[in-house]
């Protein structure tokens, strides 16, 4: 049976109004990550149906361990009519606060891929109102193809989450691109050698494989 909206957070953290530091991020299920995204010390709930990053929602946590109403990430990011909003959430810097990679793009109606209107790596904490970050920086994920999905991956074999990008490369091409994370800096820029090693070229009729269990490599189930 589904847990009521105001029930305690899985994994536990601040209870009975006690303002304690949030516990480490954990998985409520395969598509739901619980962790502190806004930096208030209380875990928030990030739901990612289908693991594509395009239908992500956030429920902000409170001091008593409950979660609020669902907010669509696309709306918080200010996606315009016709735009596709993609997001990936993880503690890329392993500092205890979740971070986000975002991409906003209007899908192309021809052979050439569209360039992203917004493509950023946003280290946490993020503002609740619009998911902005005081230390946001441009990400080149929107410069090398039209992003269709963003997924967490484990390519480096270390403790730092990496990024898998499913993108339209134009003229029927559909590729898996990658960005590996470096300690302290978040997902890096395009690297041809890494793209050859970990990426995959495909087409719309024969798309590349994409990771579906990225969070599981880095986060344990909530107790």
Language-model regions, residue ranges each:
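Beta-propeller-forming repeat regions
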Residues: 1-223
């Amino acid at each position: 049976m589904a847990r009521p909206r105001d029930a305690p957070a899985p994994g536990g953290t601040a209870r009975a109004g006690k303002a304690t530091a949030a516990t480490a991020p954990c998985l409520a299920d395969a598509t739901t990550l619980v962790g502190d995204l806004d930096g208030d010390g209380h875990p928030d709930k990030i739901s990612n149906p289908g693991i594509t990053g395009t239908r992500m929602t956030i429920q902000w946590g409170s001091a008593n361990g409950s979660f609020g109403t669902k907010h669509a990430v696309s709306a918080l990011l200010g996606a315009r009519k016709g735009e596709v909003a993609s997001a990936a959430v993880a503690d890329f810097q392993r500092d205890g606060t979740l971070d986000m990679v975002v991409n906003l793009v209007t899908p192309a109606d021809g052979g050439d891929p569209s360039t992203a209107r917004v493509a950023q790596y946003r280290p946490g904490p993020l503002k609740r109102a619009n998911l902005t970050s005081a230390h946001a920086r441009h990400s080149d994920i929107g410069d090398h193809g039209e992003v269709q999905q963003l997924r967490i991956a484990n390519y480096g074999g270390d403790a730092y989450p990496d990024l898998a990008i499913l993108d339209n490369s134009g003229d029927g091409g559909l590729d898996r691109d990658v960005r590996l994370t470096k300690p302290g800096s978040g997902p890096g820029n395009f690297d041809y050698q890494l793209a050859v090693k970990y990426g995959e070229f495909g087409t719309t009729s024969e798309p590349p494989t994409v990771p579906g269990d990225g969070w599981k490599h880095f986060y344990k189930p909530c107790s």
